[in-house]
Amino acid sequence: MSDNFEQAKSRVRQSEGAYVAMRPLVSSWEQRKLGELLLFQNGFNGSSESFGSGIPLISVMDVLDDKFITHETVRGKARLNCEEASRYCVEYGDVLFQRSSENQEDAGTSNVYLDQHVSSAFGGFVIRGKKVGEYNPIFIKYLLSSPFIREQITHRAQGAQHINVSQDTLADVALLMPSMREQEAVGLVFLYLDNLITLHQREPPHTMKEGKNANRYQ
């Protein structure tokens, strides 16, 4: 992830201020359905003895994390045979969705698997969108969290005690997709801003206060 962050900083600081100023994009954005980009499948359901050790198994907690998912960040583990490991495999660019939630607002929350070297598996309370179309994985994460997309998903989520999202609901979500070049540019800008905010949040309170006082007397 650090490589992506440094790449984002470099691009944001390029001459002409293309990404900083966010000048109007000149190419048209194409309307697509999410089902054209992803092939959906429910996750692994094993016996209680299957969990606790084995290969990394992506759960709802990983999907809800603010950071992208990688092999190292996955919290759970499960023992899967070779056929199961292949069937429930999660690879770079795949999108993971929360299948069931306790409230309407969180229904269908998504995250993206961003490990280019090692795969993982995913559990039964998660829907995997296997990457079958062309898109930038960083861009798609931010696009799927936009109000326009979230409203489509939550509006069609159903349930009483638990709010469920179906594969059909996800496949029918309408998207506006720019060119791959613009997807990369937009995605890296948001990635840079996210990392910048995170870095500032980690600063000790006294450091932030000193910085404000210094600016006051300049």
Residue ranges and their predicted role:
Residues 1-218:
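Feature detects amphipathic, helix-rich regulatory segments
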